């Protein structure tokens, strides 16, 4: 079903031959599989039976399912008749991943544009999605390769929209929507480490190595005006003691790969610095993405260790009391013997 406020995601009306597109399976016929091209306002296309799989087809329902989305490649386009022939079997796993990535970005842009059009519309003036696409979205695709990259960049550089015919109220709603929809999601990265140094100044050596490691992460960040970094800010890496010799290295990042790479670098710096002081670093758990469950497990572990430490202190005091009682018991028989004399 095509809604009044719907519009294709790209400027050209039809895809080009050899272009990867994302489709939804609509029905299965005698000649092939009928699909709708999601990026092109759901226009119809067909995957011929011979283009579904490289293998012999025994049951077509096992290869395609109505309602499922698939990445396919355009084989032929007849713009006069509106025919679009597609192939599923010619798409490699790498191309499939590329198509999915582009579609998810395009879908995010489309959702933002539709929402902005709805917010700007009134009873007297309906703003159509295509109107916004024509004014600035399609030109952004041309300039930045993908409008998603331009939208994401505008969060820190609003000047991205300079030069486009965008009214002030349109720009305000657009920026608010982009910030709400595309604001980076935090990814927490953690590594579990054992750090030891038995030299005379071992504690100072560990402190120095930790500081050097944390400063490595800060070196690539833009310092705030007051010069103080919030440990929860993106890119800041902190190292905390759980219980000697166990430490955890934690950082929050806007991109997973960037976070894993930076924490890995900080581990290397820490290892290098502590080795210089005749210390040792053992990686108990390599840098990885962690969530709320992992955080809770860490808190539980720290609480357990704290309780064990307290119990240990209490047992030492009890042992001291027992020793005193034993001494008193040993003294009492001696007093009795002396009284008999």
Curated annotation (Swiss-Prot):
Residues 301-341 are annotated as: Disordered. Pfam families: EIF_2_alpha (PF07541), S1 (PF00575). CDD domains: S1_IF2_alpha (cd04452). It comes from the Eukaryota. PROSITE patterns: S1. One of its GO terms (molecular function) is RNA binding. Disulfide bonds: none annotated. InterPro entries: NA-bd_OB-fold (IPR012340), S1_domain (IPR003029), S1_IF2_alpha (IPR044126), TIF2_asu_C (IPR024055), TIF2_asu_middle_sf (IPR024054), TIF_2_asu (IPR011488). One of its GO terms (cellular component) is cytosol. Keywords: Cytoplasm, Initiation factor, Protein biosynthesis, RNA-binding, Translation regulation. It is found in: Cytoplasm, Cytosol. Residues 331-341 have a biased composition (Basic and acidic residues). The keyword Protease does not apply. One of its GO terms (biological process) is translational initiation. Residues 303-330 have a biased composition (Acidic residues). Residues 18-89 form the S1 motif domain. Belongs to the eIF-2-alpha family. PANTHER family: EUKARYOTIC TRANSLATION INITIATION FACTOR 2 SUBUNIT 1. eIF-2 functions in the early steps of protein synthesis by forming a ternary complex with GTP and initiator tRNA. This complex binds to a 40S ribosomal subunit, followed by mRNA binding to form a 43S pre-initiation complex. Junction of the 60S ribosomal subunit to form the 80S initiation complex is preceded by hydrolysis of the GTP bound to eIF-2 and release of an eIF-2-GDP binary complex. In order for eIF-2 to recycle and catalyze another round of initiation, the GDP bound to eIF-2 must exchange with GTP by way of a reaction catalyzed by eIF2B. Eukaryotic translation initiation factor 2 eIF2 is a heterotrimeric complex composed of an alpha, a beta and a gamma subunit. This is Eukaryotic translation initiation factor 2 subunit 1. It comes from Dictyostelium discoideum (Social amoeba). The gene is eif2s1.
């Amino acid at each position: 079903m095509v809604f009044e406020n719907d519009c294709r995601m790209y400027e050209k009306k039809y895809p080009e031959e050899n272009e990867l597109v994302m489709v939804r399976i609509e029905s299965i016929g005698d000649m092939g599989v009928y699909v709708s091209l999601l990026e092109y306002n759901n226009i119809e296309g067909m995957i011929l039976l011979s283009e579904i799989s490289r293998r012999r087809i025994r049951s077509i329902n096992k290869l395609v399912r109505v309602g499922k989305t698939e990445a396919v490649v355009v084989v032929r386009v007849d713009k006069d008749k509106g025919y679009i022939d597609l192939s599923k079997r010619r798409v490699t796993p790498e191309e499939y991943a590329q198509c999915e990535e582009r579609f998810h970005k395009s879908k995010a842009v489309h959702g933002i544009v539709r929402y902005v059009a709805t917010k700007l519309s009134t009873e007297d003036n309906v703003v159509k999605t295509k109107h916004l696409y024509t004014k600035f979205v399609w030109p952004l695709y041309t300039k930045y390769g993908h409008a998603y990259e331009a939208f994401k960049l505008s969060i820190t550089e609003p000047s991205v929209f300079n030069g486009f015919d965008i009214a002030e109220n349109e720009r305000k709603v657009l920026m608010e929507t982009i910030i709400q929809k595309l604001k980076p999601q935090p990814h927490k990265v953690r590594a579990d480490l054992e750090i030891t140094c038995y030299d005379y100044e071992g504690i100072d050596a560990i402190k120095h190595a930790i500081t050097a490691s944390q400063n490595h992460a800060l070196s690539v960040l833009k310092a705030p005006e007051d010069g103080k970094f919030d440990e929860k800010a993106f890119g800041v890496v902190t190292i905390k003691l759980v219980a000697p010799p166990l430490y955890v290295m934690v950082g929050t990042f806007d991109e997973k790969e960037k976070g894993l790479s930076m924490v890995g670098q900080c581990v290397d710096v820490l290892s290098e610095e502590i080795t210089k002081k005749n210390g040792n670093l053992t990686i108990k758990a390599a840098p990885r993405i962690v969530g709320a469950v992992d955080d809770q497990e860490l808190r539980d572990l720290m609480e357990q260790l704290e309780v064990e430490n307290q119990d240990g202190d209490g047992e030492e005091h009890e042992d001291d009391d027992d020793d005193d009682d034993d001494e008193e018991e040993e003294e009492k028989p001696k007093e009795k013997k002396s009284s008999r004399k």
